[in-house]
């Protein structure tokens, strides 16, 4: 078990007899086991009750930002800066939107099979906050950046999620907590132009996202 997983689970396991064992499924969980287990993530669809979620790897997944830039003062663009290695759905996004005037798309891990111009210098989390919209595209399971986006004054833009963590992404409401786009990303520009023209609606989504994030500070228990 990774040390971060050990310390995150010890917060709860320390209250139990050390002789007791628990069933843990490590890593990015994209399937549900046939027995009750503890894990970091699980599919949203179907019967997922056998995979009980604990707040694991929180140093990476549960990062929140203080954003002092009002939405209307940000750039009228979206940003996509993620690793696309072994993630064909993210590669399709790059193929479609690299060079788009409304989306600053780039990758942070170059590989020979990708066009060299796709690679852009890695920027810090706070540098993303100059953009009104930030893409939250799922990776191996969830979109890791979704939590800090929803704590900011920018709006998360993504297809409907298919995986969830302790953050309970499956309970997020499209166009209420985030801007939903189609799974093939084909309506991205249309959706961005709409919210640029209607900033008050984007600000309502931001307020709803902030309220959702605040729930994390009052719900420390495992999710089932």
Segments from the language model and where they lie:
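Conserved small/polar residues in nucleotide/adenosyl-binding loops
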Residues: 217-224
